[in-house]
């Protein structure tokens, strides 16, 4: 959106704080229904951030796919669970939680060190090639495909990892 600087900055801070509050709600709320609604709020904030950065097609896809389908599916799955399955236990920290947090922390630091140690020299040539290709492409959807497979490759990979972890978590909760 073409907004004046202060309004754009205010909306950016507002949506960022909404993302933080919603993410904390997903993790910290004891009721899974409220966590699922908080996840929907986070996904809507991400969609609004896409609109703020003039990516209207990606924002619409975000709303349709993630909020409209996946979050509704999560809410239905949680609603079919029994109340006793997500009751609070007296044992808050187990050995499995410690191992899981150790593995996740190790993966996080290895990803951070890999990203920091990688030479990003070839990325400049890729963006220049994309600028040349964009002039030749007729369709807007082809331009979106080029951007999603080059400029936004890392965020899409991170989203796929997050969805995989959510799927594994949902399976483990359903099996208990």
From Swiss-Prot:
Which keywords describe this protein according to UniProt? Chloroplast, Membrane, NAD, NADP, Plastid, Plastoquinone, Quinone, Thylakoid, Translocase, Transmembrane, Transmembrane helix, Transport
Q: Which domain of life is it from?
A: Eukaryota
Native organism is Nasturtium officinale
Q: What is the lineage of its organism?
A: Eukaryota, Viridiplantae, Streptophyta, Embryophyta, Tracheophyta
Pfam families documented for this protein: Oxidored_q3
Q: What class of enzyme is it?
A: translocase
Where does this polypeptide localize?
A: Plastid, Chloroplast thylakoid membrane
Membrane topology of this protein:
Multi-pass membrane protein
Gene3D superfamilies hit by this protein: NADH-ubiquinone/plastoquinone oxidoreductase chain 6, subunit NuoJ (1.20.120.1200)
Q: What PANTHER family has UniProt attached to this entry?
A: NAD(P)H-QUINONE OXIDOREDUCTASE SUBUNIT 6, CHLOROPLASTIC
Q: Which GO terms describe its molecular function?
A: NADH dehydrogenase (ubiquinone) activity; quinone binding
Q: What does the record give as the function of this protein?
A: NDH shuttles electrons from NAD(P)H:plastoquinone, via FMN and iron-sulfur (Fe-S) centers, to quinones in the photosynthetic chain and possibly in a chloroplast respiratory chain. The immediate electron acceptor for the enzyme in this species is believed to be plastoquinone. Couples the redox reaction to proton translocation, and thus conserves the redox energy in a proton gradient.
Q: Which InterPro entries match?
A: NAD(P)H-Q_Oxidoreduct_6, NADH_UbQ/plastoQ_OxRdtase_su6, Nuo/plastoQ_OxRdtase_6_NuoJ
Quaternary structure note: NDH is composed of at least 16 different subunits, 5 of which are encoded in the nucleus.
Q: Which gene encodes it?
A: ndhG
Enzyme Commission designation = 7.1.1.-
Q: Mind telling me which residue stretches traverse the membrane in this protein? A: 10-30, 32-52, 61-81, 92-112, 152-172
The family assignment reads: Belongs to the complex I subunit 6 family.
Annotated protein name in UniProt: NAD(P)H-quinone oxidoreductase subunit 6, chloroplastic
Primary localization class, coarse: plastid
Question: Which GO cellular component terms, listed alphabetically, does the Swiss-Prot or TrEMBL entry include?
Answer: chloroplast thylakoid membrane
Catalytic reactions of this protein? a plastoquinone + NADH + (n+1) H(+)(in) = a plastoquinol + NAD(+) + n H(+)(out); a plastoquinone + NADPH + (n+1) H(+)(in) = a plastoquinol + NADP(+) + n H(+)(out)
